[in-house]
Design a protein with these regions (language model features):
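Alpha-helix-centered segments that form part of catalytic cores
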Residues: 145-146
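GST-like domain detector, emphasizing the conserved glutathione-binding G-site
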Residues: 1-142
């Protein structure tokens, strides 16, 4: 089923995969609506089989909205559905290198990101202050401190 714009998805500001997909959508000039934290509560959206971010809400073959996760297959789907500014090279060798670098970045470079997010005390304190706000942006300060 062809995807219509704006593409609706749920993510978190500090999620590396949300950042990846935001960069991809912006590069491709694909209009989107990003839902953060509890903004999805009243939208009657399906739940993904696995709770991962970002979660895209896209039509299936029967035009029913499905919750879809995993950035690499999502990019392949968007490449097929949107014509403007393709990100995957046409040359097969370059396309393979593109996939290889993307896979390495997805699976390995996030380890460094999580290390620096949680290793040093100043970073632990900062993350502990910011992370609860990503999923509950409407919660009062006292509740977030618990």
């Amino acid at each position: 089923m062809q995807i219509s714009e704006p593409v609706l998805f749920k993510g978190a500001p500090g999620s590396p995969y949300t950042r990846k997909m935001l960069a991809y959508l912006r590069f491709r000039h694909i209009r989107y609506e990003l839902l953060i934290g509890d903004q999805t509560q009243h939208k009657n959206l399906p739940e993904p089989k696995v709770q991962l971010l970002p979660t895209f809400f896209l039509p299936d073959d029967d035009n029913k909205i499905q919750a879809v996760v995993d950035s690499t297959p999502l990019i392949r789907r968007f490449e097929a559905d949107f014509e403007q500014r393709r990100s995957i090279p046409q040359d097969p060798v370059m396309a393979f290198l593109n996939y290889l670098i993307e896979d390495y970045a997805d699976e390995r470079l996030t380890k460094a990101m999580f290390h620096y997010r949680w290793y040093y005390q100043a970073d632990i304190d900062m993350a502990g202050t910011i992370l609860p706000r990503w999923t509950s942006i409407q919660s009062p300060e006292a509740e977030l401190q618990q």
